[in-house]
């Protein structure tokens, strides 16, 4: 019989400060210098001006994507690396590590990341965005596809949406420079939540993704979604699936979460002894694992009857998750 893993509190503050410091140092020391090659020659004055704008874009988007609210952290956004567990991607029997975006980029230029609700797709996309800044010489752009739900079909354009994302965050380019950088393959474009696009917009968004990625094929495209049969027709995209949390990862996640220590310690112990093995489909999903922790803290146990667990937790907490869907 496997011995329970001993609960050991994590210094979340040190994790945050170390990770943030490394990211900021990487961005500050490289920045414009490493992506300038994707743009036409500027005058010295233009290069300084646009370089400053690019560094502002990296600073603003890095800060925005490094913190989120969750079911646990509902009021104050938390640094994702204070609790995030890097999950693997399954591809034809192989496991692709995601701790460094460079390993993901080896898959190809067009990648689908699929997984069930709560598995952590959106937070993975944020992690890949941040890893792009730190580890590569590409310009990352993260776009939530649900933003198209408020548009008329005729106004939906990936080309304009990517440009708007750059511009809204301080990196405004003349169209000729923007188009040139796309043609040169200067971007990693992360399109999050294809499954969240309304049905009446879905065909148009699909057409936009296909035409844009075909026209500017030198860039890398990573699209997240729940599984859908629509992807069967995306012949030049490689579909990967997000792997569930291992027992070790589930325990690590619980250990990192800021929560009532006595309740967390008791849950950690039970998760190690029996709960993960008994309820693997729940405990290996970050969102459901969080719900298990909340339910356990309220009742000092997990109901034997899973229907009771659903009734107690799912309706309320999944509605809450819709409001904070970037995370778990």
Model-derived segments and their meaning:
Residues 3-326:
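P-loop NTPase signaling cores
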């Amino acid at each position: 019989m496997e011995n329970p893993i001993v609960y050991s509190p994590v210094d979340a503050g040190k994790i945050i400060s170390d990770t943030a410091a490394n990211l900021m140092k990487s961005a500050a020391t490289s920045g414009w210098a490493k992506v300038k090659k994707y743009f036409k020659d500027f005058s010295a004055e233009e290069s300084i001006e646009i370089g400053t704008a690019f560094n502002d874009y990296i600073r603003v988007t890095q800060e925005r994507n490094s913190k989120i609210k969750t079911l646990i952290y509902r009021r104050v956004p938390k640094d994702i690396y204070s609790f995030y567990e890097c999950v693997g991607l399954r591809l034809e029997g192989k496991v692709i590590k995601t701790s460094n975006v460079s390993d993901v980029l080896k898959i190809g230029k067009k990648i689908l990341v699929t997984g069930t609700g709560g598995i952590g797709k959106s937070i993975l996309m944020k992690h890949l965005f941040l890893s792009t800044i730190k580890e590569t010489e590409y310009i990352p752009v993260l776009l939530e596809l649900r933003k198209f739900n408020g548009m008329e079909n005729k106004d939906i354009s990936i080309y304009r949406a990517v440009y708007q994302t750059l511009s809204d965050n301080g990196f405004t380019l003349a169209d000729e420079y923007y188009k040139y950088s796309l043609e040169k393959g200067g971007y990693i474009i992360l399109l999050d939540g294809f499954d969240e696009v309304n049905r009446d917009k879905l065909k148009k968004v699909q057409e936009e993704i296909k035409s844009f990625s075909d026209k500017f094929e030198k860039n890398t495209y990573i699209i997240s979604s729940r599984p859908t049969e629509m992807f069967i027709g995306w012949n030049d995209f490689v579909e990967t699936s997000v792997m569930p949390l291992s027992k070790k990862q589930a325990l690590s996640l619980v250990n990192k979460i800021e929560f009532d220590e006595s309740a967390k310690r008791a849950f950690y112990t039970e998760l190690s002894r029996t709960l993960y093995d008994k309820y693997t489909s729940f405990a290996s999903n970050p969102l459901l694992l969080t719900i298990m922790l909340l339910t356990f803290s309220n009742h000092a146990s997990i109901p034997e009857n899973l229907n009771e667990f659903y009734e107690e937790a799912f309706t309320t907490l999944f509605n809450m998750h819709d409001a904070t869907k970037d995370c778990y």
